[in-house]
Design a protein with these regions (language model features):
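Conserved, structured core segments of small domains
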Residues: 2-158
């Protein structure tokens, strides 16, 4: 894809993400597998522009939602994962699909070594919407730098 983003995102329930996922990234031994049934063929991710819509469509009002930030460069070059940009398919019969192409990961689970930042538990604002940190980087962090640079910690409401 031309102008591919440096990061891709996954919203997941806290139970899907080990508490030590950020620490385990240095070992290349633990991976994000996604949900059985939903992520059996590929793992669903979102771009920075799609995360808010994903949160509203599938996680509205939930208080145990984690944001995972994955570095595209590491997923492609070090984990050898295949990122395909495909149209959304409705999860339920009769449901309208979301617009645009979404990043789908083929080739196995995503090693936590591909994380660009520690997973974040998302808070809800007074309207019940998830509060997201600033998303999107110009350059993907390298694993040697630990993925901590480039994050100002700014928060945006969705």
């Amino acid at each position: 894809m031309a102008n591919e983003p440096a990061e891709l995102y996954r919203l997941a329930l806290r139970a899907e993400v080990p508490a030590d996922a950020w620490k385990k990234r240095l070992q290349w031994k633990s991976s994000f597998t996604g949900l059985t049934g939903l992520d059996d063929v590929f793992i669903h991710l979102s771009t920075a522009d799609q995360v808010a819509g994903t949160a509203a469509a599938y996680f509205a009002g939930k208080t145990d939602v984690m944001l995972l930030r994955f570095a595209v460069k590491i997923m492609r070059k070090e984990a050898n994962l295949d990122i395909r940009w495909e149209a959304a398919v409705p999860l339920r019969p009769g449901e309208k699909s979301r617009e645009g192409k979404f990043p789908h990961i083929y080739g196995g689970p995503i090693p936590f070594a591909c994380l660009a930042a520690p997973p974040v538990l998302l808070a809800l604002d007074s309207d019940g919407k998830h509060v997201l940190p600033q998303l999107g980087l110009v350059e993907a962090p390298s694993i040697e730098r630990g993925g901590e640079d480039g994050y100002a910690g700014n928060v945006a409401h969705i």
